[in-house]
Amino acid sequence: MEAHQFLKAPGITTAVEQAALATANSALANAVVVRPFLSHQQIEILINLMQPRQLVFRPEVFWNQPIQRVIHNELELYCRARSGRCLEIGAHPRSINDNPNVVHRCFLRPVGRDVQRWYTAPTRGPAANCRRSALRGLPAADRTYCFDGFSGCSCPAETGIALYSLHDMSPSDVAEAMFRHGMTRLYAALHLPPEVLLPPGTYRTASYLLIHDGRRVVVTYEGDTSAGYNHDVSNLRSWIRTTKVTGDHPLVIERVRAIGCHFVLLLTAAPEPSPMPYVPYPRSTEVYVRSIFGPGGTPSLFPTSCSTKSTFHAVPAHIWDRLMLFGATLDDQAFCCSRLMTYLRGISYKVTVGTLVANEGRNASEDALTAVITAAYLTICHQRYLRTQAISKGIRRLEREHDQKFITRLYSWLFEKSGRDYIPGRQLEFYAQCRRWLSAGFHLDPRVLVFDESAPCHCRTVIRKALSKFCCFMKWLGQECTCFLQPAEGVVGDQGHDNESYEGSDVDPAESAISDISGSYVVPGTALQPLYQALDLPDEIVARACRLTATVKVSQVDGRIDCETLLGNKTFRTSFVDGAVLETNGPERHNLSFDASQSTMAAGPFSLTYAASAAGLEVRYVGAGLDHRAIFAPGVSPRSNPGEVTAFCSALYRFNREAQRHSLTGNLWFHPEGLIGLFAPFSPGHVWESAKPFCGESTLYTRTWSEVDAVSSPTRPDLGFMSEPPIPSRAATPTLAAPLPPLAPDPSPPSSAPALDEPASAATSGVPAITHQTARHRRLLFTYPDGSKVFAGSLFESTCTWLVNASNVDHCPGGGLCHAFYQRYPASFDAACFVMRDGAAAYTLTPRPIIHRVAPDYRLEHNPKRLEAAYRETCSRLGTAAYPLLGTGIYQVPIGPSFDAWERNHRPGDELYLPELAARWFEANRPTRPTLTITEDAARTANLAIELDSATDVGRACAGCRVTPGVVQYQFTAGVPGSGKSRSITRADVDVVVVPTRELRNAWRRRGFAAFTPHTAARVTDGRRVVIDEAPSLPPHLLLLHMQRAATVHLLGDPNQIPAIDFEHPGLVPAIRPDLAPTSWWHVTHRCPADVCELIRGAYPMIQTTSRVLRSLFWGEPAVGQKLVFTQAAKPANPGSVTVHDSQGATYTYTTIIATADARGLIQSSRAHAIVALTRHTEKWVIIDAPGLLREVGISDAIVNNFFLAGGEIGHQRPSVIPRGNPDANVDTLAAFPPSCQISAFHQLAEELGHRPAPVAAVLPPCPELEQGLLYLPQELTTCDSVVTFELTDIVHCRMAAPSQRKAVVSTLVGRYGRRTKLYNASHSDVRDSLARFIPAIGPVQVTTCELYELVEAMVEKGQDGSAVLELDLCNRDVSRITFFQKDCNKFTTGETIAHGKVGQGISAWSKTFCALFGPWFRAIEKAILALLPQGVFYGDAFDDTVFSAAVAAAKASMVFENDFSEFDSTQNNFSLGLECAIMEECGMPQGLIRLYHLIRSAWILQAPKESLLGFWKKHSGEPGTLLWNTVWNMAVITHCYDFRDLQVAAFKGDDSIVLCSEYRQSPGAAVLIAGCGLKLKVDFRPMRLYAGVVVAPGLGALPDVVRFAGRLTEKNWGPGPERADELRIAVSDFLRKLTNVAQMCVDVVSRVYGVSPGLVHNLIGMLQAVADGKAHFTESVKPVLDLTNSILCRVE
């Protein structure tokens, strides 16, 4: 603002003037200083661009590009102020010495204009080295800069800045480069003019001149004396449009500062980018008007298209707006082109009155003026026409309305009362226009442009995702998949009860008998040769293993198996427990799934079962196409040759390392005892016994994968500089982690003990002698709040980025741990490969990130400062590090000082590995309990809350109490509801118990404790041992008071339950609520029944129960036990009730929850209230839900009752969701297909298929005769004569069947479900035996709450609730009603679209009650079938598309057998229904349900809106289990009727089926089944065929059917609202995503299948690209309906 008048004022007279002066002073104090000399026009430009910032002009320098440089400096200050220590990309040479806060700079080798900049760079300071390297082509002198570019550099940095240096990189390239640097934030300044969105041309604005040639854009600002900016157009467009990057390197891009078209973009690495639409140019001062005349060109026989040669003219927005307002409001008589030109000439002159600008004016060329007049005149003509038409139509409508009589007005009034919401103007017809029409306008306004596009990164995620899903793919093939298993946690503490009203049973629960296999067994390698071949081991290793024999001593105790393997002169130990981690040679992690009761083990694709037999131990190995049995005899084997054993171990180690270097995902790391052992190939807890233990040597032949170990890793980590100070002290409150039981025997002597002996080495193997030490699986001892961990074990088991070596002064190979590093990484000791030194620490990346650091020698001098520095100097890095205790070996540093030094000088996430001696010291000196820091602000707020409390009667005991800042130590035992937290407290451990309610106080006092409520306890907790029960629910100020006053404090509670509530709403409770970290978690509940545990498993994933009650939730029964309500208002209406909040911590045998209407918001918003209400009872919970609040969240009494009535059980099943991935652009052949014209593509499709525009919209075929059943008709069959559609083209490529009207419904009912059913009475055994080729005997199926949850989830996703599910009463028609609907979609065809004479298609819907009754069973049966399918057989859509495509591609020599079922639903009869019931009986479904299903299917009534049909048998394509039983019947018919040779792939989905084989023939029993059931099979056998919307091409894969997809789009109605157009765009985008990498292959294959030209498919893909871009054109058509129906003949049976 202009402030001179206030600055010169002699005095301040009013408050307004005082405020204005303060505003002016503030604006001037924060003004931008402009130093260059500027012209008057440049000053105006800068003032307009920099608004609302105040500018102060102090000219003192001459700049070549003053406007850009001022903007650049302003944005640079913003970026550098927020980035801190950062990495800079493409820094200007002049800025190097001025910014010491940059840790690294990325440059490119200078070319062209950059050479001049380097010549003028400073010759002193840090810039001198950069200048010398740039101009002489020398390598970088230090790590502060490089000339590899941003994409080629890998220097780690968390934050970066790029000032006008990313114009030649796309957002995807920047995302990958940021990931390579480990960068989380990047501030990028970019120049993004809006003209790059326009066609090529020359654009002149008030600020700059822009020349756009289609590929590059050159921008020159006003007054520039040097060359302008030259950027790539495609990259600029990407930066303008993109707001996020998806893929393996996701980013969100936010525009945080803008000056004109100069933007600062903040790129942030985020795991799940969310939509971030933005308007880039809301303050644009130009509107771009299109000229209908293009620029002059060269003569040509064929004129070029206007779209590529048209030009735009930049017109000031105020000129265009005023011109539009003037022309639109002119009188009809006065409106003419000359008057518009006169007005435009007038407003184009600049007019000033004194210092006031009355008219800004404009200087324009003749071409621009002509374009503006033309565009304005035509646009105003269009608007005036619309105005005239609207008024004319409105007047005619008003005349009709005023002429209406009383009866008509009364009818309209009644109709409006009962009709929809009133929308003004709906009675008028709307004017429809398209984007490319003349009436759509001639101008583009940047102010209204909105962008929110995502750019996929160029990573190879397709291969990575496919490999990562290999384990689950093996499960689909019928193998065991245990990738979801995690190690089981033990229960910590006593298992008591927290309420004396509940007592456990005196009868011990029964346990299943576990067979004991303890003993000694002989394991010859020859017995496992098939397993070695399945593991794909080299022949050398297989031959060596077959020559060896081992003795395995097995000890089985408490679900754990310990094996001692004697192989030659070596002894190995392994420990098999459930959840044990298996070592791998890749990034994949495998956990062992071990069930001692079932005698099974599994991990990855391998599994085994074992059993004791008379001959010994019988083990069955399954996996990777292997099914092998081996029997191991008891006894002791002769000792194998030690030389052979050593050679086998060495060869096996070399194979593991070779596989590690070339593995993307990896497999198991094979140990000797894992291959020559009972339970091959598993070897968890690998121990190689030796006599000289030191940290790490014991794993010389063991390798736990770390991504940075792989030489071929594309993202090898780099070192960086510490961006934050080290962790200050031990006061960083660690969190105590419950230690796992040790997996190794008693520790060996400490590392300082002398070596006893060396194992013998084989002279024949040529392998040097290597000392083998005891290797133990690492054991977690402690976890700190910052994520750091302390382990007992070998640091070589760590997955950290860096490993720290306890080196010597010269960093040469030595003894102890340094020797182990040299054995593993000899190249890491090469001083020439050290990339950085920090003090005495040396950093290397060869062959993996390692830090060599030497501790002080305490044998000579005790030097604590050097010991601190030894750890501190290892923190100049990015990523985590694994440490040993430095100096505690040879240099004799005590364990305590070394541990304290590490604790004070490490980074979050680091790991410390202790040998057994140090581990025992650590356990004896474990860090203290976690601490809570009370800050001054928290203490002040708590004291304010205490003062408010002390003024009340309840809180008067708190008077005078205060909370002071400080640190409080505490112990916090958290657990699931009913886990016995309070029962674990004994009277000897505590002096005072603080509880939140009187009920809990009385319960504690009955147990003999001194219990008090929070306010009263303020008098007695000082200096006492205090236990605080339900600590999270205590008011936080009282909780802090008691924790600070107590001598020791032990907190009990559940963080997931109701916290302290701020009833008075002063805002103090949430402000001081402490963040308490549980020191232990208890997961076993002794209160909650099984069904309650299932409901709350989302909040407590590891919950288990000892309760024997399976079902405790009941609806509609009388109230029993304690009544619970949600709100205080409901208590008076329910005497004796308590609120859910008050009942927290209590236990009742029976409870009744009463949900009132006022609790709706509380139930939907507070998860904690629901958890507390659910977990108060032990036996029974009665729900009284009159308002239906629980039904609103998807659960009702009918659903639960019917589920248990149908035989459902509490339990777990695998989910039915199939993981699917979106293909990323690894080849991206789709990018070669530009968008094409929609009209030409559909016309070419019509020419190729021979289709022509149809004169009718639909055909009502003649209604066939009703052959069976009874049809109910309405008195009138109303029809419509015409249909209005919004279509993509007037040529339809689908069968034009009947629309949804009465005659069409009748024709469909009669034609599809009124045909006579041919019954076939025969045994199902033959067909079931044939079906066993694909679906073996299923066995009993368990229906669990998992299927019930999936059913409810599907209902909620469809917008349904539980109100439609009724109690199972067959007398109620609503329970058994089957509703019929007419389908609108028609089938794509290459033949005749009209003269087919086929009736329409219908879909039925069973009642929600039957769906809820049978749905869980059908889901469970479907899961059982999927688990039994052989390899190569695909069911429905329960597979990933890439897996199916890979299977088809692998069957290169096969032909495609295709069967087309005609009238598939209509031909199903009593035989197909009997087969379904037989399979249900085979699965263990209750007989009552089977008979009910048979009854519903054998005789039914289809209820249409006005018609109904009583019929028999058939199949309805909408009932529960439609896909399941249709697919099973399809499988049964195909397997029984045809025999296939060399079957490779078979796929079945409903009535569609294909089989890839070399030859087929009809089986002998086929004719009987076909004739008996009246089947209509049409078989085809060709090289390529169609299946379920894809083209099946053996050897190539399953490719999307472009022709069929495009043809089906022509039949649908895409209007009248914009929602349908959005659905079209989304559907087409999803389809194009499947074409990303196979577009060119689709062109060749699809054209061959349909016999069309490849150019058609190419054109169709381009058309789909245009539709996905939102450029679809719709045509409104009104076509008649051809009615060919005749009289319906009914025959009553």
Swiss-Prot record:
Ranges of residues in domain RdRp catalytic: 1454-1565
UniProt keyword annotation of Transcription regulation present: no
Swiss-Prot/TrEMBL cofactor(s): Mg(2+)
Stretches the record annotates as RNA-directed RNA polymerase: 1207-1693
Pfam families registered for this protein in UniProt: DUF3729, Macro, Peptidase_C41, RdRP_2, Viral_helicase1, Vmethyltransf
UniProt GO molecular function: ATP binding; cysteine-type peptidase activity; helicase activity; identical protein binding; metal ion binding; mRNA methyltransferase activity; RNA binding; RNA-directed RNA polymerase activity
One Gene Ontology term from the biological process aspect of the record: viral protein processing
Annotated stretches, region: Putative protease: 442-509
Domain (+)RNA virus helicase C-terminal per the UniProt entry, residue ranges: 1083-1216
Region Methyltransferase, residue ranges: 60-240
EC assignment: 2.1.1.-, 2.7.7.-, 3.4.-.-, 3.6.4.-
InterPro entries: (+)RNA_virus_helicase_core_dom (IPR027351), Alphavirus-like_MT_dom (IPR002588), DNA/RNA_pol_sf (IPR043502), Hepatitis-E_Cys-pept (IPR008748), Hepatitis-E_hinge (IPR022202), Hepeviridae_RdRp (IPR047307), Macro_dom (IPR002589), Macro_dom-like (IPR043472)
Compositionally biased tracts (Pro residues): 739-752
Residue segments, region Y-domain: 241-439
Residues covered by the Macro domain: 775-921
Subcellular localization, as worded in the UniProt entry: Host cytoplasm; Host cytoplasm, Host perinuclear region
Annotated ranges, domain Alphavirus-like MT: 56-240
Catalytic function, reaction form: RNA(n) + a ribonucleoside 5'-triphosphate = RNA(n+1) + diphosphate; GTP + S-adenosyl-L-methionine = N(7)-methyl-GTP + S-adenosyl-L-homocysteine
Compositional bias annotation for Low complexity: 753-763
Binding-site positions, ATP: 975-982
Free-text remark on how the cofactor is bound: For methyltransferase activity.
Ranges of residues in domain (+)RNA virus helicase ATP-binding: 934-1082
UniProt keywords, alphabetically: ATP-binding, Disulfide bond, Helicase, Host cytoplasm, Hydrolase, Magnesium, Metal-binding, Methyltransferase, Nucleotide-binding, Nucleotidyltransferase, Protease, RNA-binding, RNA-directed RNA polymerase, Thiol protease, Transferase, Viral RNA replication, Zinc
Subunit structure: The protease domain interacts with host EIF2AK4 (via C-terminus); this interaction inhibits dimerization of EIF2AK4 and prevents EIF2AK4-mediated phosphorylation of host EIF2A.
Domain observations: Contains a methyltransferase domain, a Y-domain, a putative protease region, a zinc-binding region with similarity to calycins, a proline-rich disordered hypervariable region (HVR), a macro domain (also called X-domain), a helicase domain and an RNA-dependent RNA polymerase domain. Since the boundaries and the activity of the putative protease are not clearly defined, the zinc-binding region might be part of the putative protease.
UniProt name for this protein: Non-structural polyprotein pORF1
Organism: Hepatitis E virus genotype 1 (isolate Human/India/Hyderabad)
